[in-house]
């Protein structure tokens, strides 16, 4: 149970993603005066990309919840507002929380500036058009999510709540007329896109995914015909596609687009200037540590910080 604070502080939070929302909620609930700045016109940050991935539609409800909590606990929400160091200094805040998230990491590959190349943010956030043949560089959580997203036909987007669609895909016999509750033959559909999911490491793809769900994600992608390539050396991106060395052989993956999902770097450009100005400043979420996008970890870290301030 959160204890009310003895001394109310004036706190600025920059970034309304999972970490910024969690901190603002917990700090305001304890009695602090919180102003939350967000450069976009809506709250959510990375959640706004995650909720577009099949099976993660429930994040929309998470955002609705946080939106209500901001109102309930009096968080002053400033959307569409990009703040600079001077803005925060003029605000005379007791403490500043930077929950500014991450930037996609761009690998050093010959031809990385080719028009075929898209970042995962171009696909999930900006709605870039993607061709039918795709290579995904990076097979962590983001690479898997982007692959799942690209496999869905936009004209048949599921809400994630349609059991009939799930049963059909996996051959579940809802009539219970057959032994084991499975149909004799699953009607396989042609995948919406042809996808190569690639990683540099020679280990199994998706090894860092959840222990209880990683196998399911791998199975789902394999069922949809995704080609999973480990131990890949990237040589070049050109008009023909992505040139790689795999199993000692050089080959060209003839694709329309190459999607970069090779990690992130912290977005913390405000930190040095604020620290130099003597402001008590904290980094949370991806701005603190840019590992695989981890909303649960970011929310926990931000909440624990709010309980200490």
Over which residues does each language-model region extend?
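N-terminal Rossmann-like dinucleotide/flavin-binding domain of flavoprotein oxidoreductases
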Residues: 43-93, 206-232
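Rossmann-like dinucleotide/flavin-binding elements
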Residues: 3-37, 43, 78-88, 92, ...
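Short, hydrophobic/aromatic-rich segments at coil-to-beta transitions
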Residues: 238-242
